[in-house]
């Protein structure tokens, strides 16, 4: 890579036109790439009035901003000297372009973003309200950073510009508070409906339990009455059997007494007859002896 240096080394003019038409070239391998090489590469996009090479980077000054933007678009990420170039407009904030194999720091993720704190505040109070009423909180919504455009306020009308900004912030906060109150009222209605449904279910369950308890009491009473009736019938049967047995014993005892009386009478009659016969025999024997 060779070339003849024909441009100036001045690339640090502070006038707006020069700043807006200046190109920054980063990640430059200055050990291999020289100033003439840079001029040869970037000269095809427009006339170069200045070029300065430093350790690891360089600046190219064009006459027109249009030429500078064309160079940024055409040569960005081009590999020269074994390294991809990081090219952007010198007068604009440098966008973050991470190198291969490195992690992007978290500070650069949200450097140009502002969080919508009203959004997160309403979400926090809603989740706190749900937790206090025993409801399971929903999963948190994904964080969506909102990029707010920069508003330029003229210095001559500074007071009016500040007032308009304050008014806009008040209107935004008022809108968020009204939306938050509406959301809370909707949630209250939903909670009220759910509580009513739960109360209805509890009442129906209590009614069923009362019916089951009454049925159990009725069945227990009927079973108890049946047991008592069975016991009474058994006792009556036992009493009747006892009475029958006593009557039979009484009858058998009467028959035995009559038999004994009859036997005694017969024996007495037999004794009397025997004694009479003996007397008669004795008398007859005496009469025979006397004759």
Swiss-Prot record:
Residues 225-257 have a biased composition (Basic and acidic residues). Residues 152-185, 216-291 are annotated as: Disordered. Pfam families: RRM_1. Residues 21-92 form the RRM domain. Residues 258-275 have a biased composition (Acidic residues). Gene3D superfamilies: 3.30.70.330. GO terms for molecular function: RNA binding. Belongs to the RRM HNRPC family. RALY subfamily. The keyword RNA-binding applies. It comes from the Eukaryota. Residues 182-219 form a coiled coil. SUPFAM superfamilies: RNA-binding domain, RBD (SSF54928). Keywords: Coiled coil, RNA-binding. This is RNA-binding Raly-like protein. Residues 164-182 have a biased composition (Low complexity). The keyword RNA-binding applies.
């Amino acid at each position: 890579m060779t070339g003849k240096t024909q441009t100036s080394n001045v690339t640090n003019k502070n006038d707006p036109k020069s700043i807006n038409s200046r190109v920054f070239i980063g990640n430059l391998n200055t050990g291999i790439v020289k100033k003439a090489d840079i001029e040869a590469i970037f000269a095809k996009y427009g006339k170069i009035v200045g070029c300065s090479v430093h350790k690891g980077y360089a600046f190219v000054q064009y006459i027109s901003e249009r030429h500078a933007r064309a160079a940024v678009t055409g040569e960005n990420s081009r590999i020269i000297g074994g390294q991809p170039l990081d090219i952007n407009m010198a007068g604009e904030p440098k966008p973050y372009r991470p190198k291969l194999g490195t992690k992007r720091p978290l500070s650069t993720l949200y450097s140009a973003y502002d969080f919508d704190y009203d959004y997160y505040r309403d979400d926090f109070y809603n989740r706190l309200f749900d937790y206090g009423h025993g409801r399971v909180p929903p999963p948190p919504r994904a964080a969506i950073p909102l990029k707010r455009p920069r508003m330029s306020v003229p210095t001559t009308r500074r007071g009016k510009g500040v007032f308009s900004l304050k008014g806009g912030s008040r209107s935004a906060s008022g809108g968020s508070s009204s939306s938050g109150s509406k959301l809370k009222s909707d949630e209250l209605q939903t909670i009220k409906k759910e509580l009513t449904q739960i109360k209805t279910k509890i009442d129906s369950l209590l009614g069923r339990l009362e019916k089951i308890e009454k049925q159990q009491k009725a069945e227990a009473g009927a079973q108890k009455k049946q047991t008592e009736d069975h016991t009474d019938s058994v006792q009556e049967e036992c009493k009747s059997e006892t009475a029958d047995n006593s009557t039979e014993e009484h009858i058998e005892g009467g028959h035995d007494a009559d038999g004994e009386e009859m036997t005694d009478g017969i024996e007495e009659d037999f004794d009397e007859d025997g004694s009479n016969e003996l007397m008669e025999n004795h008398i007859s024997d005496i009469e025979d002896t006397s004759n």
